[in-house]
């Protein structure tokens, strides 16, 4: 198993990341997706990443558009807008939406996912 390699944290992500001394290869952000939280979460997550580490963002909707047919109400704007704003402010953070997965995702016969991978660059 991966019990000794994976740590799930339930709680205030920003506070956890501010207070941990650990470094991680992967940080999965899937909590409060509000813009103001994302604006604090992403920089804190970058601070606790190992070199070449990655951030996995959930509910990242490029251009704030729905990913699935008939799901116009299912768009969470905070992660996308927050990342765009951080990049405009000079944060060197590249994000690539995962797009389609080889398996069905949220809706039957759909392979689109709202996951995106982010990395720091120099």
Please state what every model-predicted region is.
Residues 1-122:
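S-adenosylmethionine/decaboxylated-SAM
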């Amino acid at each position: 198993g991966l019990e000794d390699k994976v740590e799930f944290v339930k709680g205030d992500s920003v506070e956890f990341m501010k207070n941990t001394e650990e470094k991680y290869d992967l940080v999965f952000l899937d909590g409060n997706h509000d813009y103001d939280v994302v604006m604090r979460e992403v920089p804190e997550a970058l601070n606790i990443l190992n070199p070449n580490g990655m951030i996995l963002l959930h509910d990242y909707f490029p251009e704030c558009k729905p990913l699935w047919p008939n799901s116009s109400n299912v768009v969470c704007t905070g992660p996308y807008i927050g990342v765009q704003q951080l990049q405009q402010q000079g944060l060197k953070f590249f994000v690539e939406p995962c797009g389609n997965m080889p398996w069905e995702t949220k809706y039957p016969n759909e392979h689109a996912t709202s996951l995106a991978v982010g990395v720091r660059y120099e």
